[in-house]
C-alpha cells in the first residue's frame, strides 16, 4: 500500500471564549492517499471547518501536525488548493481572468496563462462563458469558476469546505457529478468537508464520521459502489444502506449538538 499524500497526526485545537475554553478538536488523525476522494462529515459544531482551516494553513493547531508527501507543513502550502463555501470569485475579473489568477501571480505571460486557464475553463464546462463576469453567472457557475481557478494552480491536494452548500439540490447533484468527473480525469486527491450525507456517499471512496465536540474521527466508512455514481446507483439499496450506516453513527452526535445549543440558550447573559 502506498504512503498517504496527506497525513493529519493527532491534531488538537482549543478556543478560549468569554464562557471558558472550548475543545474543538481532540487528537484527530486522517490519512488520504494519492487519487483518493475522502469526505469528512459530522454534526454542526464538531470542528469540521476548524480541521479544514488547520490543514489549509489558515489556523494553527495546539498540538499534532499536518504532513504533505511525508513532510510537515506549517501555514499555507502550494501543494494544497482550497475551495470555500463562500463566494470567492473576483467580481471585477472575467471567468478566464479569475481562473488564470494563480498563473498571473506565478509570473506567466498573458498568452501562456490564458491558454492554460482555458483548459480548466473547458474542464468545468464553462467554455463559451470565459469572457463573462461573475455577476452574469449563476451560483453554480461561479463555484465552477472558483474550482477551475484552484485546479489551475495544479495542487497535489484539493481541499473543499462545503462548496455546494449554498446551491439548490438539483445544482448540487449536477456539480457533484461534474466534480467526480474532473477529479477522476486529473487523478486529483480530494478532501471534502460536508454535512450532507448523500453528497458524502455520492462522491467519496471513504467517509470519515466525526464526533461532536471535541471532534475526532469516530468511524471510517468505505464506500464500495460503482462509478460513475449515476441516478441508478444513487437510487440503489446499496446507496441507501450507506446512508443508513452513516446516519446511525451521526445521530447520537447530532443530538449532542442540539443539546449544547439548547444549553447555551438557557445560560444567563454575561454580566
Predicted regions and their residues:
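The feature captures the beta-strand-to-loop junction immediately N-terminal to the Walker
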Residues: 41-43
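Helix-to-loop junction immediately C-terminal to a conserved catalytic motif
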Residues: 56
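Conserved ABC transporter NBD signature motif
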Residues: 64-76
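Short coil-to-helix segment of the ABC ATPase nucleotide-binding domain corresponding to the Q-loop/switch region
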Residues: 93-100
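Conserved ABC ATPase "signature" region
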Residues: 104, 111-129, 181
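Conserved ABC ATPase signature
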Residues: 133-137, 141
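A short, proline-enriched helix->beta-strand linker immediately N-terminal to the Walker B motif
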Residues: 152-156
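Catalytic Walker B motif of ABC-type/P-loop ATPase nucleotide-binding domains
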Residues: 158-161
